[in-house]
């Protein structure tokens, strides 16, 4: 297992040349992101806020993204017990930063309101508030709701990853194990979210990406024997020589992992079979999981030079993890997801 560089002091994320000053990982947003420091074309800058809330029976995902040449605002509702999901997205041409997403996840508001839909992610009274509405979300049915996120852990996964191309980077924070409460109305159905059962993750991303990428990402949040617990795992893009994004969350603290491998089954022709059991292993032997899928939120889009092929697979993990102090904890039927996404963007 190779050594990973932990960032421990606050400093600007980017130098005068637009490159990362200090690649590595951190436990909070120590590197300071300023959009004005980026030297790339506004067409190439990608900024997004993504929230996922679930109790393992239903799920809600909300996205506001400004990808330079294209804005993407998306709502997903997933019903794992009934084995269906609905994702409806609205695209905006050439936002070029006009969405004005905050330069930190710790303050500010991410908001969008267009014909037939609106979303707002903001801070109020020490909590994160998510409000959303979309007409004709599923057929003629609208969706709307308000969700409050609390109990944010002391530490989060933060990583500054360079690409080998100058001026290209990805700055990312994952805040797992937040508790969620609120309500969702979809058509004539109402779903109550209670903080003893629902957990949330924030995927906060800012950067300049190269054109063609494939990434693997997995995440889970919940409780293990009454202790807030989860993980973030992933790889596939950028130069990760300084650090990986693989961590365990336990009791509000991070336990750093080495490299994690996603073993997705394939058929005799080499095509991936996403709904068959997966296996996850790590080079430090601290993360071993068998994954049983229950629902594949798949999406494919190809338009000219733009392509997105997504498989976000939800299911249950069984295996074991090892904390920094050597404590081995068994994990059984722990709900989360793992995905493979290819983008040309």
Predicted features along the sequence, with ranges:
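Structured soluble/peripheral alpha/beta segments that form catalytic or ligand/cofactor-binding pockets
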Residues: 1-345
